[in-house]
A protein has these predicted regions:
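Terminal or standalone catalytic/regulatory effector modules within metabolic enzymes
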Residues: 132-136, 142, 146-274
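C-terminal helical cap(s) of enzyme catalytic domains, especially alpha/beta-barrels
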Residues: 81-104
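Phosphate/diphosphate-binding loops
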Residues: 102-117
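Alpha/beta enzyme core
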Residues: 1-47, 63-70
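Thiamine diphosphate
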Residues: 53-65, 75-77, 90
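Active-site beta-loop-alpha junctions enriched in small/polar residues
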Residues: 1, 21-25, 50-56, 78-80, ...
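Active-site/ligand-binding-proximal alpha/beta "capping" segment
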Residues: 29-43, 114, 118-150
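Glycine-rich phosphate-binding active-site loops on the catalytic face of alpha/beta enzymes
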Residues: 22, 68-85
Length: 274
């Protein structure tokens, strides 16, 4: 219902295409097929499906989305595909050959392009992530592909490299604490900040919930709960929101978190003619 209502709102706003951004690669094949089909039936608009291959199963989700009627999908050249990148575009094209959705793309030409990027990638080998295989754990922690490698580097910089499983677990716990918010830049960074903060300070989800425990939350978390990045459809969990913002029942102006608002409405006007 959430996705269909969001699509209807976008359609009323005048969009020409609906883009489904599966940041973590957590949209499994059956869900991808049903979602794309429902969006097309509801709006009649073209649907573009984007995902990441952290799980190793994203190509199946892309093919299912195509089966559901997707008009555009994202893939990566063979040499740059897989893991936290997009699924293999060459494999997707090959899988569709001979069927109703045959792309007509010349795979020999694609391979020539891929060979170029294979050479270019070698130049950046010293900066490659140490991730060597996909992980189904992404279905649990829901960490966006664009954040996964960066957060591992942050963990290493903080001396938490050997505690990465704890960081991933904390990420999942923070997501639940925050009310299962949409995790994409910049909100995903806030979830990551809090996960690192919890592991570095040996805090559990119960510790964060405990009203008697004083916690100096990271500034990015305070900013999120102030609504500076927007508000989720159902708001933030009230008890945690009051704790993060330091709401005090003894002071009427601080007794409750702020009501939802559009952050841009509070910005000073800008004269674009200047």
């Amino acid at each position: 219902r959430y996705y269909l209502e969001t699509a209807r709102q976008l359609q009323r706003a005048g969009v020409h295409l609906i883009g489904v951004k599966d940041m973590a690669g957590g949209c499994r094949p059956r869900a991808a097929r049903e979602l794309v089909r429902a969006l097309r039936e509801e709006t009649g608009l073209p649907v573009h499906f984007h995902t990441h291959d952290t799980s190793g199963a994203a190509a199946a989700s892309v093919l299912a989305a195509i089966d559901g009627g997707a008009d555009a999908v994202d893939g990566a050249m063979d040499a740059m595909s897989g893991l936290t990148s997009q699924p293999n575009l060459g494999a997707i094209v090959a899988a569709l050959e001979g069927g109703e959705r045959d792309t007509g793309v010349d795979r020999t030409a694609m391979q020539q392009i891929s060979h170029y990027w294979e050479g270019a990638r070698r130049l950046y080998a010293p900066f490659e992530s140490d991730i060597r295989a996909g992980t189904a754990d992404v279905y649990r922690h829901e960490m966006p592909g664009g954040q996964y490698t960066n957060l591992r580097e942050q963990a290493r910089a903080l001396g938490l490299e050997q505690r990465w499983p704890e960081v991933a677990q904390a990420y999942a716990e923070v997501n639940r604490l925050f009310g299962d918010i949409v995790k994409v830049t910049p909100t995903s960074k806030v979830v990551g900040d809090m996960a690192l903060f919890m592991v570095a300070n040996d805090l559990s989800a119960d510790d964060v919930h405990d009203p008697a425990r004083q916690i100096a939350f990271p500034e990015s978390v305070v900013s999120l709960f102030r609504g500076e990045l927007g508000f989720p459809p159902d708001g933030f969990p009230p008890a945690l929101s009051r704790k993060v913002l330091g709401c005090d029942s003894a002071h009427p102006l601080l007794a409750e978190p702020p009501a939802p608002y559009r952050p841009g409405d509070r910005l000073a006007p800008v004269d674009l003619e200047q």
